[in-house]
Amino acid sequence: GTARLFIAKGKVDNFDTHKLLDFLEKTTGVNKRNIDDVKVMDSFSFFAVPYEEAEKVLKIFQQKSGGKKSLVSRAKAKK
């Protein structure tokens, strides 16, 4: 299965689907072919990765945040 993640980057940060995929691949080492269901909004985006990659992605962004709120978190379930 896949995990849906939220990232606090969007169009105002000059991101589109292509740039977000490149950024995620470069930052996490996750092959962009494994990143799916990308939705880029104005100030945030969503993407899906396989469960086993999700923990790695969350951990990497948690470490990069230096104790501040991480750029990436689990997306809240759709109501």
Question: How should these model regions be labeled?
Answer:
Residues 1-79:
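Terminal-proximal interaction/regulatory segments of ATP-powered molecular machines
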